[in-house]
Regions:
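A ligand-binding cleft/hinge motif common to bilobed small-molecule-binding domains
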Residues: 89-94, 236-253
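Extracytoplasmic/periplasmic substrate-recognition and gating elements
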Residues: 248-313
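Hinge/lid segment of periplasmic solute-binding proteins
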Residues: 87-132, 143, 256-261
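Paired acidic/hydrophobic, glycine-rich loop segments that form the ligand-binding mouth/hinge
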Residues: 82-85, 233-238
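Glycine-centered hinge/linker elements that transmit conformational signals in sensory
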Residues: 191-221, 246
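Periplasmic solute-binding protein
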Residues: 111-147, 168-191, 272-280, 356-358
Length: 367
């Protein structure tokens, strides 16, 4: 394998990552529900992102018809949950969750996104997540302005200077600082834990400071309204953020995902890809949890979740005869590009680490 050209290596990687949706198929234990266990009586509480609670309610109703003795409800209290789906899990909190090696076919997942505690798997990735600049081409077309692709492009754009790009703290870390730190030698584990050396972090923050000082990128805790109304040249945010506001965009909008804006010409475009990951608490009824997790990762339920949420799955699924949203094509075209280096990351940052990183980022934007 060491003799393969970088291009061939990229193509092989895409077979199991960027084209994950299309390469999978129904496996023996993923196509239908099992009938055994229908007599199991237990309660499960699920905590997940409010955005896809409705989608989970539909899955729960379908599951309940097969297992009427299992009571499953949603909760907003993650400490009360038997099943938690979250995009961040620190090592200390992870101690409260069970081993999941036998609850799903591990080969169906992106290996780097499986959350491990030592040699044991305690988290199964459900949805992919990533951050980068999203651009609506419509305002650029109106102003006859070129759409920027690289770092130098935004400095040379009068449209961007007049309509600064916006970002929140998480977008700035995952879409700007982390990719630059990777270019300087940081590993996926380094940026996932947030435990970056002072030297690496300084290099990652240097270009962000230059961008902040120029005024062409501004920090905002609520940039969505400006993006929808075309009052900003771009939004440095997560895929989930875009999905939430997509239905509010003008019909003539054309959304473009451009993670390379943090990189200069000639530099690698690094794209950290994370996941919303499923964890099962040790206190949960083991049999009930196993039944639900197995059912959740069946092809039929994953397809139902894709349809309802428009979120890209982190597990192989057979999508034949199933139309995919336009936003999917934009996302996967970037993910599959040979110009982009995909770096899979499990976010294990502690609250204190996130707070420290936020303070550093805030200091760059202080007037």
């Amino acid at each position: 394998m060491n003799r393969l050209s970088p291009f061939i290596k990229k193509m092989l990687a895409l077979a199991s990552s960027a084209l994950l949706l299309l390469t999978g198929g129904c496996t023996a234990n993923r196509g239908v529900y099992k009938t055994e266990g229908s007599s199991v009586k237990a309660e499960l509480k699920i905590c997940c992102n409010p955005y896809y609670e409705l989608a989970f309610e539909r899955v729960i109703r379908t599951f309940g018809s097969a297992y009427p003795n299992l009571s499953i409800t949603l909760t907003s209290n993650k400490n009360d949950a038997d099943i938690l789906i979250t995009d961040r899990m620190d090592n200390e909190s992870a101690k409260g969750f069970a081993v999941l090696d036998n609850m799903a076919d591990i080969a169906e997942f992106i290996p780097e996104l499986l959350y491990r505690s030592g040699e044991k798997i305690i988290g199964l990735p459900l949805f992919l997540e990533t951050s980068g600049i999203w651009i609506d081409k419509l305002p650029y077309i109106r102003e006859n302005a070129a759409v920027p692709c690289r770092f130098s492009d935004i400095f040379g754009s009068e449209f961007v200077k007049s309509n600064p790009m916006l970002a929140d703290r998480e977008g700035l870390y995952w879409g700007f600082v982390a990719p630059l730190c990777i270019s300087c030698g940081a590993s996926a584990e380094d940026i996932g834990s947030g435990n970056l050396s002072q030297e690496l972090l300084a290099q990652g923050l240097e270009r962000l400071k230059k961008t902040a000082d120029s005024g062409i990128l501004k920090k905002s805790q609520n940039p969505s309204d400006s993006f929808v109304s075309g009052k900003t040249a771009g939004w440095l945010c997560s895929y989930l953020d875009i999905i939430k506001i997509q239905q509010n965009m003008p019909l003539s909008s054309k959304l473009v995902f451009s993670p390379g804006i943090a990189a200069e010409k000639g530099e690698n475009i690094n794209l950290p890809v994370r996941a919303d990951t499923l964890f099962v608490a040790k206190k949960a009824d083991k049999k009930a949890a196993e039944l639900f997790v197995t059912a959740l990762f069946s092809d039929s339920n994953i397809l139902r979740l894709i349809t309802d949420t428009h979120l890209p799955p982190a597990v192989k699924v057979n999508c034949k005869n199933h139309s995919l949203p336009e936003i999917f094509r934009e996302f996967y075209s970037v993910l599959s590009s040979t110009a982009v280096k995909t770096v899979y990351v499990t976010d294990s940052r502690s609250d204190s680490t996130v707070s420290q990183l936020n303070n550093l980022i805030d200091s760059l934007f202080t007037p």
